[in-house]
């Protein structure tokens, strides 16, 4: 059976589809599993041994559709369910099943704080999309595979971090999903251990300010600013070596879960009720439940729409770390 999975973006969402890839490949007889995604997310899936072929969306959806038509798929699993994936399914003209994104229920929660969302993780809902094919959840969690060239040797890290460290994935796609700088510093001080800051080029400036802050103090927190220095897969390699991961609601959180790292997940304007907490790994949720304005979006904003950003500014770091 030749099956196409579609999920065009983004990092975390694609990682959350990996159990579907695995169970289809291992539970269907003679399964040939293909995946369609955007070219910029190539590194997430390129080493996945359960995939037979990956198809990339560049600028032209028509080119991708023509490429997919030539494959003559038996079944399409749409885990994105938007206008472009509808165009793909319609053009291919084969049996398909799409995930229900529960957008109306999310809208009710965001706009009226009425919560009819199921107490169910998005991964389990993804797997239900494939139920007609006879597959079952194998309870193995998420997958993330790194090529040998992207494995970061431990001696690339400072000596202070080679015998154990905590990772902090400090980035996020939207500002309202990230702690402000002063709260990041407060968090790092509370952690009080050798700490690797992970993120992209957008986090470099704040990460350097955090490093300088602790460099000028006598503190147990020793900062290595890795932001902007490593590729996504290299950052994943660092996560895999960590003892504990702190993360905003972002892609690296799900990659950490794939490696079965313990995660402390930090939530601002979004909420765990959306069904995207760390999957099948030990985790703790840090969120401000004392305010009535969250969630204010199912995704995020460039700034707090009310101007006070209480979800992060008043967040309590009520956790304890043990040796």
Predicted regions and their residues:
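Catalytic machinery of carbohydrate-active enzymes
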Residues: 1-323
């Amino acid at each position: 059976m030749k099956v196409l999975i579609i999920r065009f973006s983004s990092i975390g969402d694609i990682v959350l589809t990996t159990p579907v890839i695995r169970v289809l490949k291992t539970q269907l007889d003679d399964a040939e599993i293909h995946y369609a995604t955007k070219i910029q997310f190539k590194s997430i899936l390129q080493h996945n041994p359960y995939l037979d072929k990956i198809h990339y969306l560049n600028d032209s959806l028509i080119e991708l559709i023509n490429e997919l038509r030539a494959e003559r798929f038996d079944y399409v699993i749409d885990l994105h369910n938007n206008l472009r994936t509808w165009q793909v399914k319609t053009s291919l003209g084969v049996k398909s099943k799409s995930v229900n994104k529960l957008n109306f229920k999310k809208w009710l929660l965001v706009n009226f704080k009425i919560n009819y969302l199921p107490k169910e993780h998005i991964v389990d809902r993804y797997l239900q999309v494939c139920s007609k094919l006879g597959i079952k959840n194998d309870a193995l969690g998420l997958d993330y595979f790194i090529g040998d060239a992207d494995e970061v040797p431990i001696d690339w890290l400072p000596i202070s971090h080679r015998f154990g460290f905590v990772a902090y994935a400090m980035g996020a796609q939207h500002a309202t999903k990230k702690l402000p700088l002063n709260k990041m510093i407060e968090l790092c001080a509370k952690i009080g251990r050798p700490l690797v800051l992970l993120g992209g080029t957008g986090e470099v400036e704040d990460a350097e300010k955090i490093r300088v802050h602790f460099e000028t103090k006598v503190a147990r927190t020793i900062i290595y600013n890795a932001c902007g220095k490593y590729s996504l897969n290299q950052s994943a390699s660092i996560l895999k070596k960590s003892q504990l991961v702190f993360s905003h609601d972002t892609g690296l959180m799900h990659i950490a879960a794939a490696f079965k790292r313990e995660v402390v997940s930090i939530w601002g304007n979004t909420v765990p009720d959306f069904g995207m907490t760390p999957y099948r790994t030990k985790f703790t949720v840090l969120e401000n439940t004392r305010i009535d304005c969250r969630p204010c979006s199912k995704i995020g904003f460039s700034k707090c729409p009310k101007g006070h950003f209480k979800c992060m500014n008043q967040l309590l770091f009520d956790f304890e770390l043990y040796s």
